Amino acid sequence: MSTGALQARTLVELLREHGHGPFTGVPCSFLGPVISCLEAEHPQEYVIAANEGEAVALAAGAVLAGRRPVVILQNSGLGNTVNPLTSLCHTLRLPVLLLVTWRGRPGRPDEPQHELMGRITQDMLTSMGVRNEVLPDDPALLAERLDVAAGHMDTTGLPFAFIVPKGAVAPYEAAAAAPAPAAGPPLMKRAEAIGHIVSAMDPDTLLVATTGKTARELERDWDRPQNLYVVGSMGCASSVALGVALNTPDRRVAVLDGDGAALMRLEAMATIGRHSGTDLCHLLLDNESYESTGGQPTASAGVDFAGIAAACGYRSTHDVRDADALRAAVLRAQQDGGAHLVRVRIAPGSDPNLGRPALAPPASAARFKEAIAR
């Protein structure tokens, strides 16, 4: 019998009691409480992955080492798992347990980018040979189903997935941590940094914005026909921008990227560098967190994005923290032409009243195409 939403600690401890761990994955707000619990109570057992396919591969390695890993992912990233699930886990018979959130669940309101994947999530898992069922919200029933999942994985050597609907896991209340001492002047908020970027760049610049709150803040404060708001498809904005730039050689192009998004598709920087003569200003807003899914940490704190861009062949790289340096870097990049990276260190957090996009995604794309054609 249902008892309401599961407590995150209850879910984590049930998984651990059944021998599961380590945990790895990419955040979704539906499973944010689970990640918060792992980070607070079992940090050595949680590995932040850059994308869902990497998480499955990490889990496969854990299986080879004798563990029973759990992969955490949003169903919008399920496509990233297709190759490692079908050609690694299935082929080598390496069973991993998946917790897949159910955004876009049919009959439930959600954002347009989740509609198709929400409709096909169960069928997609089934077609990949991944037995799946909806996560029970009753602890006793969940314990029974974990036994079933373990039996299936042990017998077949194949993965098993629990699909996690919205609200299935209750918020996790962690003990308040002491605030970290400030290191230097306060960083800009993302909306402030976006404002400095837009005001510094050529007004005719074609600007592609990554998914989540970056695109939403750009639309709210600086909407114009030359903006494209990429919803979903996390990590793809820089490649979209390069595709635009390669095919509009007479236009200036820029992309507002994020640290989590850049890490998810880090290979895009190699392709941009290979085409470093193409006019593309890559603006990487780095707050060291997945802000749009609840502020879970990314792995960006230890990543030298400027060094990577330089090694990939970008014409110049900048690592900035203040408004003056940011504006100067944008102006310099657009004056010099070619591919340039500007990493912008920003503070975490955003406006709690930030609304959803006003412009439907197809309308945004159509308007952007018209702006290019003019």
Predicted regions and their residues:
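Residue-level marker for buried hydrophobic side chains located in beta-strands
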Residues: 207, 253-256, 283
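A contiguous pocket-lining binding segment that forms or flanks enzyme active sites
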Residues: 279-313, 319
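DG-centered beta-turn motif at the end of beta-strands
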Residues: 76, 251-269
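Thiamine diphosphate
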Residues: 1-241, 246-251, 320, 355-374
